[in-house]
Amino acid sequence: MPRRKKKVKEVSESRNLEKKDVETTSSVSVKRKRRLEDAFIVISDSDGEEPKEENGLQKTKTKQSNRAKCLAKRKIAQMTEEEQFALALKMSEQEAREVNSQEEEEEELLRKAIAESLNSCRPSDASATRSRPLATGPSSQSHQEKTTDSGLTEGIWQLVPPSLFKGSHISQGNEAEEREEPWDHTEKTEEEPVSGSSGSWDQSSQPVFENVNVKSFDRCTGHSAEHTQCGKPQESTGRGSAFLKAVQGSGDTSRHCLPTLADAKGLQDTGGTVNYFWGIPFCPDGVDPNQYTKVILCQLEVYQKSLKMAQRQLLNKKGFGEPVLPRPPSLIQNECGQGEQASEKNECISEDMGDEDKEERQESRASDWHSKTKDFQESSIKSLKEKLLLEEEPTTSHGQSSQGIVEETSEEGNSVPASQSVAALTSKRSLVLMPESSAEEITVCPETQLSSSETFDLEREVSPGSRDILDGVRIIMADKEVGNKEDAEKEVAISTFSSSNQVSCPLCDQCFPPTKIERHAMYCNGLMEEDTVLTRRQKEAKTKSDSGTAAQTSLDIDKNEKCYLCKSLVPFREYQCHVDSCLQLAKADQGDGPEGSGRACSTVEGKWQQRLKNPKEKGHSEGRLLSFLEQSEHKTSDADIKSSETGAFRVPSPGMEEAGCSREMQSSFTRRDLNESPVKSFVSISEATDCLVDFKKQVTVQPGSRTRTKAGRGRRRKF
């Protein structure tokens, strides 16, 4: 496709643009940029090729820039450190110059825009200032000054430093706006600027501006001078730049920063202005800043005083109360003793009361004590009944004895005190249960405990003879409670813990009192002969294992095999054990012949039948570990018998030895089993004599073969 480039037209357009730029100086830089951009535009006939050409130009530009960067990097790499340092200094100087030049250009543009806005807004400002009065103090007179001189405004903006315009925002051409305020004069009609150090006034025609505002404010708050000055800004929403204003105060009064309606109307009309607040923040309109600061200071003082008062209250420490000690629920008389002590304290406070009042108090206290004991007795008996009913199991027989104790204590409520009945219940309950702090509830095996009939007989024998003793204990308790509380607790502990209240150690199966069982358990290393203490989980697992073994025995009854030595039927499980025992008996008793073997087999069969009759008794005697071992060994033995056709020798289990073999045979078999166990059947290489392979010759290898193999490996890895 043909392409045409119109450079002549572009040159003429650029000349026209330069003429227009001379007329409008504000848009020179923008139009120059446009002119430079237009110079690179290529016009073509086809519309579809324009984006492709633009993309090609961009690619070429990026390539050129990348090449230039690469060349610069190469040059920098070839330069020495001193040359690189000098180049960095030059670069930083250039950047600083560019930044400074940009700031200067922005300041010049701002000044020009402000001057143009002042020239455009001058007539409206003049009319507003003519119709607007200013409120002054009572002793001063308000004067108005019409600002019609344009040179004065230009001089004002020349005096304003450029730092005030840096934070201003320009938008939509309306960049800034300033209005001259009329000046309030006192009887002296001269305009005088404020000096920061003293309150004197210098006669001059220059007005006061915002750059002196902070100093004059600080001076006015410190001491009241005759003539002060304040710049009062106003709030208005919109965009624009800084709004500057100065107000000169009156003679005798303090300074007044009063807003005017005309200013607000003018601001709302023009819009696009941002007013900056100088001095106190959040000062409302129409309020004296001095009074406002005094209010803030007063609030701060009140706040500090309230803080100090609150901190003083925090320093007062509160006294600690009496310690709360744990008590067993069975000791009712301790509670009664505490009630008596509290009542005695109250009596000590009111010592001036008469004897009649004391007697009445004692009677009321006795009635309260009786009602408390009855209520506590009933509630404790009910709660213990519920707990015991929940905790008793069908396999144990101690639940009946506990219920019988509860019934007897309820019948003997008149003679026996409530503390003793509750103590008896807790003692029996401690036999049933271990302490509650344990994670699982551990129950005692019923074989080690007394039956229900024996407990009834013992209590019937003890109860009539021990009533007098219990009454004596109660009298001793009542006497000692007031004097010494600790001795009373010891007496109750001794009376409640009877000789039968002993806990058996689960390791060595020895009985100890509850106070010594913990110390003994810490150092006990003994092994228990029988599992007398079983948890609920252990009992459940034990019952499951017993039921499983019983089912297996019932299934295996039908599987009997004939022994060809003694010609008797032997169950399938114990066949191997029976054959081995018969062989040993035949070797040992060669003179007896088949008679001795027949006796041995008859004894074996009798013991096996006894084992089938009482599987539950065996389950009680054996522990959980033995039952699991028996199950696992039965399974492994069955698998071995099915797999082996030649009937190799099998290690018998301890349960099978108990049921099928005599004691003499057990001793011989245990020795044989230990010697011929699979663990000890393995022999080390050095001790192997009957082996077909000579391991010693295999171990010694020639060093040359090793080196060759290593070399071969290395060659293989290389390839």
Swiss-Prot record:
Compositional bias ranges of the Low complexity kind: 195-205
Region annotated Necessary for interaction with NR6A1 C-terminus, chain positions: 400-500
Q: Where along the chain is composition biased (Polar residues)? A: 117-130, 412-422
- What ranges does the record give for the region AIR, renumbered to this chain? 270-400
Could you state what the record's PTM comment says about this protein? Sumoylated. Phosphorylated upon DNA damage by ATM or ATR.
Cellular location of this protein? Nucleus
- Tell me which Pfam families the record gives: RAP80_UIM
Q: Which part of the chain holds the cross-link Glycyl lysine isopeptide (Lys-Gly) (interchain with G-Cter in SUMO2)?
A: 20, 31, 75, 90, 188, 245, 382, 387, 428, 544, 559, 562, 587, 607, 635, 642, 696-697
Recall the GO molecular function terms of this protein's record: DNA binding; histone binding; K63-linked polyubiquitin modification-dependent protein binding; ubiquitin-modified histone reader activity; zinc ion binding
Sorted alphabetically, the keyword list is: Chromatin regulator, DNA damage, DNA repair, Isopeptide bond, Metal-binding, Nucleus, Phosphoprotein, Repeat, Transcription, Transcription regulation, Ubl conjugation, Zinc, Zinc-finger
Could you tell me where the Basic and acidic residues compositional bias lies?
9-23, 359-378, 614-623, 631-643
Please list the residue ranges that the record marks as compositionally biased, kind Acidic residues: 349-358
Looking at the record, which segments are called Zinc-finger-like region? 505-582
Q: What is the effect of changing K52A?
A: Does not affect symoylation
Q: Give the PROSITE patterns listed for this entry.
A: UIM, ZF_UBZ4
Tissues in which the UniProt entry reports expression: Expressed in testis, ovary, thymus and heart. Expressed in germ cells of the testis.
In the record, Phosphoserine modifications are located at S29, S44, S46, S101, S140, S205, S379, S402, S419, S466, S627, S653, S677
User: What outcome is documented for mutating K9A in this protein?
Assistant: Does not affect symoylation
* Written domain comment of the UniProt record: The tandem UIM domains form a continuous 60 Angstrom-long alpha-helix and mediate binding to 'Lys-63'-linked ubiquitins. UIM1 and UIM2 bind to the proximal and distal ubiquitin moieties and recognize an 'Ile-44'-centered hydrophobic patch. Since UIMs don't interact with the 'Lys-63' isopeptide bond the UIM-linker region between the 2 UIM domains determines the selectivity for 'Lys-63'-linkage, and its length is very important for specificity. The Abraxas-interacting region (AIR) mediates the interaction with ABRAXAS1.
Name by which UniProt lists this protein: BRCA1-A complex subunit RAP80
Q: Which organism is it from?
A: Homo sapiens
Q: What is the lineage of its organism?
A: Eukaryota, Metazoa, Chordata, Craniata, Vertebrata
